[in-house]
Amino acid sequence: GEFKNIEEFKATTGGLMAYFYNEKSELREHIMDDLVSRAVGLMSWREVGEVLPYYCEGLIHLALLFEAGAITYDEQIEIDYSSYEALKGVYKRAYRDLAKHYISKADASLYLEDYAIKEAGVYLPKDEKVRAFVEHYYARYKAIGQQSVHIEDI
């Protein structure tokens, strides 16, 4: 089934839940930065089957980050640190829904379908704002993400 494709989200978000219930206000911006960085970085794994669960994790994170207003995208990602409380609420809801999903032993694809749909064999965000970002990021990654620079050329 699809459980492997929601497992990594469960693991990362479980850590976030532990933090939310024992948080330090001076770490809030760092937590948001790390979360955005992880979610964005995972988009590069889009076509690598062995790490599809990580890509799916990133799609869910991005959906939640956009939903909470924690990030916006207009040719570049902007992080709104004032949305921290909204972000926390969105993640608590998503994690509670995920726990209910596991308890009821429902098909994992039903949980994933809240955030992504499979088109031409690739999971893509359902939300248009998230999709616009993911498509732009992946096109840039394909164009320049695997280039290397020789030190002598600098």
Tell where the protein language model's regions lie, with residue ranges:
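Long, well-structured alpha-helical subdomains associated
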Residues: 16, 20-125
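An active-site-proximal "capping" alpha-helix that borders the catalytic cofactor pocket
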Residues: 4-20
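Alpha-helix capping and helix-loop boundary segments enriched in small/acidic/polar residues
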Residues: 1-6, 27
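Extended, compositionally biased alpha-helical segments that mediate assembly or anchoring
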Residues: 103-154
